[in-house]
Structure formats: C-alpha cells, structure tokens
Amino acid sequence: MKLTCVMIVAVLVLTVCKVVTSDQLKKLRRECYLEPGDSCFHDDGRGACCEGTCFFGVACVPWS
C-alpha cells in the first residue's frame, strides 16, 4: 500500500514539474515568425519579428 501511495505521489509531482517547465520554456523561447513589412497588429511585438522590431503594432521594421 505504501509503495502505491509513493508511486502516485511521484507521478503527480513529475506531472506538475513537467507542466511548470513547459510553461516556463514557452515564455523563455522567442520564436520569430514575421518578416520585415509583415503586420504585427495581433502580436505584442516580443520576438515575433525575425529581423527587426514591431513598430507600434503596425508592421515589422528591420534594424538598420
């Protein structure tokens, strides 16, 4: 009985750790998917533009 309880707790702890780690990785990883000139209106501009930055939520502007 004790072994079953220990295994259940271990699975729950590992599941929680996996969810937390996955969420943190998503926040840390910045995947770009917009090219210069693409609209970034629906994006908050954090890491979406591959070469440049989101200019006031209008379009990706390349760094010069």
Curated annotation (Swiss-Prot):
Keyword Disulfide bond: yes
GO MF term set: toxin activity
Tissue: Expressed by the venom duct.
Coiled-coil region list: none
Keyword Metal-binding: no
Cysteine pairs bridged by disulfides in the record: 32-50, 40-54, 49-60
Record's keyword terms, sorted: Disulfide bond, Knottin, Neurotoxin, Secreted, Signal, Toxin
Signal peptide as annotated in the record: 1-22
UniProt domain comment: The cysteine framework is VI/VII (C-C-CC-C-C). The presence of a 'disulfide through disulfide knot' structurally defines this protein as a knottin.
Protein name (Swiss-Prot/TrEMBL): Conotoxin Cal6.24
